[in-house]
Amino acid sequence: MKKTVLRVISSCLMALLALGLFYLCSYAVLYLLAVLGFDSDRYTGLYCVSSYGLIMLFLWIFWRIARQSEEFIYFKKTSPSQKVSVVLVAIGLAGIVTIYMFGAAYLSKYLESLKEHLDEYKQTVDRYSDVPQEQVPLWDSMIYILTTFTLVPLCEEFLFRGIIMGQMRKIMPVGFAVLVQAVVFGLMHGLTLHIGYALICGIVMGLVYMFCDNFWMPVLIHSIFNFLGSSFSNILNLKQLGVPSDIRANISYTLVLVKYFFMFPAALAFVYLWYRYKKNKEDEARLIKEAMEAVAAESEEALSC
């Protein structure tokens, strides 16, 4: 009983420590840039790559130390069919969130409080809400675009699906661990609207990680989701590219249709991943049972002799 309690406390503290490192590194970089004279609103790309790079470094060191007692981030080999399924799930998830946001926009016409939350969300996700694009160097815009679908997904997945979910799996059924990390992931995003779809994404990515036992699968989903959700539109909106507004609108509309189209295949892919997971668990249970029966038979034979 005492060992169980200590294990629970240890896992919770490890998860909280990792979360604390995340915020500590973010604020440390923000402070350092301010001291050096960089406006984080203007140099958002520099801030993102610096903060997430530092976070990733400290979380990696944290993992290397913590895994010495017991591994908790898994990199099980996945089949090509599983990888294709994960890509489909990522695109379908982007479609679900698009519907979520369209629904929120529609309801905001009738709910003033929701309209305020929606305006706040739009301002938060708009790269140039505080500083006009003309005042932002092109190199910083490019760094920001690249970081949002590479380093950001890697770092956040390492924290939430890797460390937090990994620690929770030690002390509770994996299904509950998926829910806990998803709630923390949702709350971390702060805004009311953002919390809602971040919670959905956290559950889906947690379940896919559970199905595949391969950390790179939720990273892949997160990366594709971020690219379709923000990076691609930020590329189109770069004034240096000079893409006409009507062409941008047509491309954006086509992308929305593609997301919707992939929702049904994504659902089938998700069911397939679940089926593979369920079958593997049944096979493992059968092998364990056969091994135990073989040991029991050998013991009986030895006693009879």
Specify the residue positions occupied by each region the protein language model found.
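Functionally important transmembrane alpha-helices
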Residues: 23-28, 182, 194-251
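Function-critical hydrophobic alpha-helical transmembrane segments in multi-pass membrane proteins
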Residues: 119-190
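Hydrophobic alpha-helical transmembrane segments
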Residues: 9-16, 45, 49, 83-91, ...
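Hydrophobic core of alpha-helical transmembrane segments in multi-pass integral membrane proteins
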Residues: 17-24, 53-61, 90-99, 257-279
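Membrane-interface segments at the starts/ends of alpha-helical transmembrane spans
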Residues: 36-46, 125-137, 244-258
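Interfacial transmembrane-helix boundary/kink motif in multi-pass membrane proteins
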Residues: 2-20, 69-106, 110, 250-261, ...
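C-terminal membrane module of polytopic membrane proteins
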Residues: 223-305
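Alpha-helical transmembrane segments in multi-pass membrane proteins
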Residues: 20-67
